[in-house]
Amino acid sequence: MYFSEQNKMIRKLARDFAEKELTTEILDEVEESGEFPQEILDKMAKFGFFGIKIPKSLGGSGGDHMSYVICMEEFARVSGVASVYLSSPNSLAGGPLLLSGTEEQIEKYLKPIITGKKKLAFALTEPGAGSDAGGMSTTAVDMGDYYLLNGRKTFITMAPLCDDAVIYAKTDMSKGTRGISAFIVDLKSEGVSMGKNEHKMGLIGCATSDIIMEDVKVPKENRLGEVNKGFSNAMKTLDVGRLGVASQSIGVAQGALDEAIKYAKERKQFGKRIADFQAIAFMIADMATKLEAAKLLVYNAASLMDNKKNATKEASMAKFYASEICNEICAKAVQIHGGYGYIKEYKVERMYRDCRVFTIYEGTSQVQQMVISGMLLKK
């Protein structure tokens, strides 16, 4: 229905890579150390995953949004945190540059993250401005030759690992969201510091921290796009970002369902497999049906984007439903495993922790409902 021959080839490539490289031993080590192996990231870059949906003319692999969804799904099925690294250059990090970057900015910032030579963070959220991104207090004052940035961004994925960050700041405090501009900030600049490395529930192996800016001088050529047009850049970037989280969600959910089915067939109680009990069998049927529905929402949103159609509502629907049912499926997978599901030795324990953030980051479920209802009910 949705997949081209190229899409099918990319699915096989992504699945084979994830299953071969992301072994249980490596993922257990990531959980213990909190660090993701650089050699695997280098291989992901070499295979073209970091530019899977970026045009070849810009150094990417030239795939479509469906190819991106497929790669995210297959990586997340094995490792949620690996899919975060895959997502970044294709989505939140690369997106702002694809939308508004100059030739020089593309060359200097986009191409190096595609090849894996550099990492770029997306910094929108603040301590007092999460869902209400327009309520940010970070400022950028035009000083003539440069902008002077002051403020704090919070919960920034990969911030401690990144070379640069796309920072959104108020250039006109009187205009609300229409007074926000985007900037590319060198994180080694004077006045930039990192908050503590957050100890997260899940997605261990991808550091998260605040970015603090105190009188940071940013060259004029590092403004991304037009003055006061940054909020539009951020929102358009998040459309693709939400597609990415939806893809993560169906991937992790598929992994959890696979583990639940496998365990239900092997585990015996009362003299028979627990899969033979209707309570378990119906639970699995429910999980599989909801997952299939979520996949169709995700693929539909990707298809609309590939056909150059507005998919804001559909991306929000996909993100909302897929993330919610992923949490439900992972919880049921743990339940099917019984006590073993609570033990780190079993994969579903990690999946259960990893998926919890899917209903929160890149727009909470409640924000998605606001977007969906707003588009349906507007005059």
Swiss-Prot record:
GO CC aspect terms: cytoplasm
Matching PANTHER family: ACYL-COA DEHYDROGENASE (PTHR43884), ISOVALERYL-COA DEHYDROGENASE, MITOCHONDRIAL-RELATED (PTHR43884:SF12)
Q: How does it assemble?
A: Part of the homotrimeric caffeyl-CoA reductase-Etf complex composed of (R)-2-hydroxyisocaproyl-CoA dehydratase CarC, and the electron transfer flavoprotein (ETF) alpha (CarE) and beta (CarD) subunits.
Q: Which residues bind substrate?
A: S131, D239, V240, G241, R242, G363
Q: What Pfam family is a match, any one?
A: Acyl-CoA_dh_1
Name-wise, this protein is Caffeyl-CoA reductase-Etf complex subunit CarC
Specify whether Oxidoreductase is a keyword of the entry: yes
Binding residue positions for FAD: 122-131, 155-157, 267, 278, 335-339, 364-366
Which reactions is this enzyme annotated as catalysing?
Answer: hydrocaffeoyl-CoA + 2 reduced [2Fe-2S]-[ferredoxin] + 2 NAD(+) = (E)-caffeoyl-CoA + 2 oxidized [2Fe-2S]-[ferredoxin] + 2 NADH
Q: Which residues form the active site?
A: E362
Q: Which InterPro entries match?
A: Acyl-CoA_DH_CS (IPR006089), Acyl-CoA_Oxase/DH_mid-dom (IPR006091), Acyl-CoA_Oxase/DH_mid-dom_sf (IPR046373), AcylCo_DH-like_C (IPR036250), AcylCo_DH/oxidase_C (IPR009075), AcylCoA_DH/ox_N (IPR013786), AcylCoA_DH/ox_N_sf (IPR037069), AcylCoA_DH/oxidase_NM_dom_sf (IPR009100)
Q: Which segments of the protein form a coiled coil according to its record? A: none
Requisite cofactors: FAD
Q: Which GO terms describe its molecular function?
A: acyl-CoA dehydrogenase activity; FAD binding; oxidoreductase activity, acting on the CH-CH group of donors, NAD or NADP as acceptor
Q: Where in the cell is it found?
A: Cytoplasm
Specify where it is mainly localized. Answer: cytoplasm
Q: Which family does it belong to?
A: Belongs to the acyl-CoA dehydrogenase family.
Give a short account of what the protein does.
The Caffeyl-CoA reductase-Etf complex catalyzes the reduction of caffeyl-CoA to yield hydrocaffeyl-CoA. It couples the endergonic ferredoxin reduction with NADH as reductant to the exergonic reduction of caffeoyl-CoA with the same reductant. It uses the mechanism of electron bifurcation to overcome the steep energy barrier in ferredoxin reduction. Also reduces 4-coumaroyl-CoA and feruloyl-CoA.
List the Gene3D superfamilies hit by this protein, alphabetically. Answer: Acyl-CoA dehydrogenase/oxidase, N-terminal domain (1.10.540.10), Butyryl-CoA Dehydrogenase, subunit A, domain 2 (2.40.110.10), Butyryl-CoA Dehydrogenase, subunit A, domain 3 (1.20.140.10)
Domain of life assignment: Bacteria
* Manner of cofactor binding, per the entry note: Binds 1 or 2 FAD per subunit.
